Amino acid sequence: MATGVSSRDGSRERIRRRAVARDHPGCGPHRLDRPIGHIRYPHRHSISFSPFASLTLSHDPAPSQSVGKRPQKSTKTASRRKVETAAADAPRFINRELAWLEFNARVLDQADDPSVRLLERAKFLAITSSNLDEFMMVRVGSLKLQAVSGGGRRDPSGRTATEQLQAISKRCQGHVDRQYELLRNELLPLLGEHKINQVDPAECSDRLLAAAERHFRGDVLAVLSPQALHDRRFPMLPGLGIHLCVQLRPGDEIGPQRTPPPSDSLDNRVPSNLKRNSDTANQQPTPAENISAPEDGAEQTEPETQFAVIPLGRTLGRVIPLPIEKPPIEKGVAPKESDDTSPIESGYSYALLEDLVSHFVDEFFPGREVIQCKPFRITRNADIELREDGAGDLLGGMEEVLESRRLSDVVRLEIDANANSEIRDYLIKSFNVDPQFVFDIDGPLDLTYLFALHGLKGMNTLRDDEWPPQRSPRIDPAESMFTSISDGDIMLMHPYESFDPVVRLLEEASVDPDVLAVKQILYRTSRNSPIVAALMRAAERGKYVTAIVELKARFDEARNIEWAREMEQAGVQVIYGIRGLKTHAKVCIIVRREPQGLVRYVHFGTGNYNEVTANLYGDISVLTCDEILGTDATMFFNAVTGASQPQPLQQLGMAPLTLRRQILDLIQGETERSRQGQKGEIIAKMNALVDTEVIDSLYMASQAGVKIRLNVRGVCCLRPGVPGMSETIEVVSIVDRFLEHARTFYFRHGGDHEMFISSADWMPRNLDRRVELLVPVIDPAARKRLRETLQLYFRDNQNAWRMQPDGSYQRLKPRKNEAPMRVQETLYHQVVENRKAGKHAPQSTFETHRPD
């Protein structure tokens, strides 16, 4: 419609003017006399990208953010100096680590909420356990390195690394205590009431014990291998696995000796280009030997007690189904036929692998008396990154990072709370663990086993009702995706609207004879990715396919390495990322030959190209064939892959070059309008708000009277509602069935209502150390819908938490006479209603032309 064209063009011109001012500060809109490609911004020198390509590798020096490398000096603006001065003022900022622990506490509150269905509560408890594992590996690991090397340097909240570790330890001890109190006192008893029973082989009936023993002898005994620990270094055990520590002493009767299969020796050499955590990683572990055999045939005097370890590994399932305990059969009533281990209405019984092995542990040690056998678990430091200045081969370097991570220091030790002092002291000494990060666990270690219970079949009444993703009314299954996008921009809200159109677009492109090229960035993908399959199929059919595969995506490195190799073999031109930066932008470009010429079809997103997590994460997709956006996307992609000087983009914001400046300019614009008596308003939704410069800019906007509403799911270092500093700032967090992952931003902009989606949170790593995109939402209907959706997040009174000035959170409840409102449920019902309305509903509203 004409209205849409007029509004779109007005938005473009405003974006173009801002881009000129952003890229060329001090120049008028027509003075482009600043050298292109040498854009200066706080934190860095001028940048050109240097990609790691699959065949040709660049060895030019580049900025590196690796652990242990001294950062380059940079010219700081007056604004930046102001922020650094403010950062020393502790009351201005919440500590990042404690803010994250507040987030995990909100997830734990979901597990503690009786209004949430039982298996969903179990799932939330499992999530808190998984979250805490990653926090310990990454954040605690990083702080321990800082405590050793950083001296007394303080973070923006005013704490040293040592002080942060002390605060984290205290908070985590309370968090873990609360997890297990909830498990013992509520969840396990409630599960038992619904006939989902966790069985301890030491306390069960003879019938269940017989079934447990059959499983142990048939499926477990032959797989596991104990390792002796007498007079030898502790074996190199994997992190996050469950292991059994066994305390032994000589028995009165010596039974037949069994020699368990020897474990493979481990090569602990560490590549010179990797940051090491301590000298302990250079120790060479000794393979386990027969527990009873003396070394080299020499006689040995056995000590009074010995220790052995049994790694349970990951081959065997941890949750072991057992027969259901059936009630006595009444006389004259025929028993019902059922599968003893199927989770039907009659129930489900299970034992944990560590309990099973502990009960029958004597079988591994004939001739020895077992004093005690207790499970333990270690967490290793995962904050090890490639020092890219010394890595000529990124793929090989990342494989070495994975190996080094496997051998890194232990940052946390979890032990069964009933372990005796000998086992406890032995483990602490063996792993050289900081005592404040030793956790005595009164219950099963590693609560992620509860995920398995959440997936039990036949327990639907204990889970949330299904909300199947809906097809967008803008997409007709009978027509090509190219036709649908040609009719106008399509915005999808996942997971309420299906991610299938994104997958379908790539699958159609792979076989369409008119498609000439496909360009794709992959950060995290699924295990059997249809998107990767489509890229390989396109390359095999002779299309020009380029994929940037970010090998440095933490904890997905191994999968991405595997995909990169497979795609190369299929003929895809693979780029391994950019030296010194992580490529985190979500963009796909398809170049298609059409009667009017070449057309670029582009997908921009806030989430990963992962069709599995797209059903669990709240994200935004925009599908467009807009010429200017397509041109910008191509220039962005060429800059990333071609080691060329980035050119100014008309509409897209790009980190680490211009995105920070653009965000600050947008906030500053609202500040200036408010000072001039106009209405200033900012609504922003993101995963984390950490950057002190952005926070300081928001404080200034608040002091000028700008209304600021922030929906921050996780870490928020800003203090809202502080008189004289942030009185007009409101921060809420939504924790519900879907993970809130979208980054969307609204600026009133004098009534123009500018909307953006982005791959970037407002964190230093996103703005300065990653390749990210900020994408304007130009289509008027999409812009209106996105703005209304953002506003809904501040009406939730069921699963919303409002942040307090001290960094704590209060759960929002309906006020008197206020109806309950749950934003995720509301969004899903809206999508269902839109789907029912259909694609060809008559226009019911009219939009007039308005002057810019």
Swiss-Prot record:
GO biological process: polyphosphate biosynthetic process
Enzyme Commission numbers on file: 2.7.4.1
Coiled-coil spans in chain: none
Membrane spanning residue stretches: none
Keywords (A to Z) from UniProt: ATP-binding, Kinase, Magnesium, Metal-binding, Nucleotide-binding, Phosphoprotein, Transferase
Chain intervals with Basic and acidic residues compositional bias: 20-36
Region (Disordered): 1-36, 58-82, 251-303
Residues the entry annotates as binding Mg(2+): R524, R554
Family, similarity comment: Belongs to the polyphosphate kinase 1 (PPK1) family.
Role noted for this protein: Catalyzes the reversible transfer of the terminal phosphate of ATP to form a long-chain polyphosphate (polyP).
Name of this chain's protein: Polyphosphate kinase
Gene name in the database record: ppk
